[in-house]
């Protein structure tokens, strides 16, 4: 069974086509600059070779059609015809409180996702464009929505509510939702398989660290807390997002600088974090190089970045009354040994010991703690697309029973 996974952004569409009987990736790629000059599709051929196809892509329906044309292309396609695609799974950012799991898309689901656009104004409208496009181009093919927020719906109320007047939760749904849920769900399940331990009784801290970053406390296979909040802005210091900040500092800067709410949002989301402190780049690899050169601002930025992660690991250990596994994933978590060792260097009180040799691993599943470490520290590369495809297939199978 072939399942197509789409991740639609405001000016991009990423795709992966899976053969679900073997979990093999048959095709993958993405369109950039939708609605802008110079739009193109970049695909990876089965032999690893990259190919770029330039074409004017004014909107998402044209983009999805471009992907379909590419998938069926005689030279570099992956299917003979589109009838081979049995379902399409979509990454949808925000499901609010409406969705605690993945769902078959129908008119009611679309209406509910539209209602959540206020909560995910940058992502949900783009996710919907992908859904509308497939409805138009492949109307008979079932579609499934997999929500970034769903995994965190098991958080208790005392963890997800903000201590502001309760009426704002009742009126506007102001609460912590959390994100990267599909990634946290995948890696927390996968690490139990990898270590040969049951999810029941496990206490796992999953650190998804990339340009965006979040941590989740996963107890018995369920999320009990996570660092991101109403939006992906809360929590860790990230590439361009500030993470936790005193609300008073926000209103103070707005008054001093005469900033509108939208301008302040841009400052906190696009101009802060590593970029705001380091001022040269938001890329952790460039920061690492600057630290190696002894640049003081780079060293300060890195210390802040690691400290936030370490602090949350300590907090979530307390929240779960212990920890068995600390897991690193995401672009930085999977590939940057200095980040992992930097985060773990003050976790000795938990009995964490990192093996410097094992920690050299990049992008592969590995235990990087020593044999006598009281807590297992593990790298598990995330695979959100496979998780989306698996959910899609499971829902399709349940329909056919």
Predicted regions and their residues:
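N-terminal glycine/serine-rich phosphate-binding loop of ATP-dependent small-molecule kinases
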Residues: 1-96
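Glycine-rich beta-strand-to-loop/alpha-helix junction loops that act as flexible
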Residues: 9, 90-93, 209, 323, ...
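Phosphate/pyrophosphate-binding loops at sites that engage ATP/ADP/AMP, CoA/4′-phosphopantetheine
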Residues: 70-85, 191-198, 313-324
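Short beta-strand-loop/turn "lid" adjacent to the catalytic site in phosphate-handling enzymes
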Residues: 71-123, 144, 150-159
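Glycine-rich phosphate-binding loop of actin/hexokinase-like ATP-binding domains
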Residues: 151-255
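Catalytic phosphate/nucleotide-handling subdomain of diverse soluble enzymes
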Residues: 219, 225-257, 266, 330-361
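Adenine-nucleotide phosphate-binding core of ATP-dependent small-molecule kinases
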Residues: 266, 273-277, 284-319
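Internal helix-turn-beta structural module
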Residues: 299, 303-324, 333-401
């Amino acid at each position: 069974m072939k399942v197509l996974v789409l991740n639609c952004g405001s000016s991009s569409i990423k795709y992966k086509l899976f053969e679900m009987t073997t979990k093999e990736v048959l095709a993958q790629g993405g369109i950039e600059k939708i609605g802008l000059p110079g739009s193109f599709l970049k695909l990876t051929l089965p032999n690893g070779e990259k190919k770029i196809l330039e074409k004017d892509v004014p909107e998402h329906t044209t983009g999805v059609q471009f992907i379909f044309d590419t998938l069926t292309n005689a030279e570099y396609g992956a299917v003979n015809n589109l009838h081979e695609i049995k379902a399409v799974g979509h990454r949808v950012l925000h499901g609010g409180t409406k969705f605690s799991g993945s769902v078959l898309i129908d008119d009611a689901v679309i209406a509910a996702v539209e209602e959540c656009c206020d909560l995910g104004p940058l992502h949900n409208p783009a996710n919907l464009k992908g859904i509308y496009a497939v409805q138009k181009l492949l109307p008979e093919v079932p579609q499934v929505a997999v929500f970034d927020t769903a995994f965190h719906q098991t958080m208790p109320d005392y963890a997800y509510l903000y201590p502001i007047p309760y009426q704002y939760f009742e009126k506007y749904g102001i609460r912590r939702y959390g994100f990267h849920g599909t990634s946290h769900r995948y890696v927390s399940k996968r690490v139990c398989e990898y270590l040969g331990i049951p999810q029941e009784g496990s206490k796992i801290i999953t650190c998804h660290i990339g340009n965006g970053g979040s941590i989740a406390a996963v107890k018995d296979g369920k999320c009990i807390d996570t660092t991101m909040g109403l939006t992906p802005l809360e929590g860790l210091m990230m590439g361009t997002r500030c993470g936790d900040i005193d609300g008073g500092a926000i209103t103070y800067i707005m008054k001093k600088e005469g900033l509108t709410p939208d301008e302040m949002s841009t400052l906190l989301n696009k101009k802060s974090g590593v970029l705001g402190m380091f001022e040269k780049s938001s890329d952790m690899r460039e920061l690492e190089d600057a630290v190696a050169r002894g640049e003081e601002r780079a060293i300060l930025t890195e210390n802040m970045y690691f400290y936030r992660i370490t602090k949350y690991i300590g907090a979530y250990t307390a929240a779960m009354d212990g920890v068995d596994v600390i897991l690193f994933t995401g672009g930085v978590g999977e590939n940057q040994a200095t980040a992992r060792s930097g985060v773990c260097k003050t976790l000795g009180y938990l009995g964490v010991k990192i093996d410097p040799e094992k920690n050299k691993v990049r992008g592969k599943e590995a235990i990087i703690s020593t044999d006598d470490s009281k807590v297992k520290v593990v790298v598990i590369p995330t695979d959100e697309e496979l998780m989306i495809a698996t959910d899609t297939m499971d829902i399709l199978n349940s329909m056919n029973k």
